A protein has these predicted regions:
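Long, amphipathic alpha-helical "stalk/connector" segments that mediate intersubunit docking
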Residues: 1-30
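Short, surface-exposed helix-loop/turn micro-motifs enriched in polar/charged residues
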Residues: 2-3, 72-73, 92-96
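Conserved AdoMet
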Residues: 7, 35-90
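Amphipathic alpha-helical scaffolding segments comprising HEAT/armadillo-like alpha-solenoid repeats
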Residues: 23-28, 58-63, 102
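Alpha-solenoid HEAT/Armadillo-like helical repeat scaffolds in large eukaryotic proteins
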Residues: 30-31, 106
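Glycine-rich active-site/cofactor-binding loop and its immediate structural neighborhood
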Residues: 84-92, 97-101, 106
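Conserved small/polar residues in nucleotide/adenosyl-binding loops
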Residues: 111-112
Length: 112
């Protein structure tokens, strides 16, 4: 799986978690059942890392969001922002410009 595919699968799961506060293991099982999302160790690591740091990431996002509070940011956008901020702050393997570019690309794909 490419890093982009991992990120896309993680995005869907993080977004689902924002919509439904189900246990993450249940979301993994559902994803496996419908076979639309690949849930491998790489996806799980990214999802769980982002969810573990969600409160801290939201604080950082809030610092840069001068016009909207974190609760007013659409959940679909928040999921993408959390992944991007996580990669920028904690993922040494992803250069900052790549994390930003991937977030913009993902936003453009979902906001067609």
């Amino acid at each position: 799986m490419t890093r982009r595919e991992i990120r896309n699968c993680a995005f869907i799961l993080i977004y689902e978690k924002l919509l439904r506060d189900d246990p993450i293991e249940e979301l993994y099982e559902t994803a496996d059942e419908i076979e639309e999302i690949t849930v491998n160790d790489s996806v799980k690591i990214l999802v769980e890392s982002v969810l573990e740091k969600a409160e801290e990431l939201d604080g950082k996002i809030s610092n840069y969001s001068t016009t909207r509070s974190i609760t007013r940011i659409p959940k679909i956008n928040l999921a993408i922002l959390r992944i991007a901020f996580y990669e920028i702050l904690y993922d040494d393997l992803t250069p900052v410009n790549v994390a930003i570019n991937e977030a913009v690309l993902l936003l453009s794909l979902i906001h067609i």
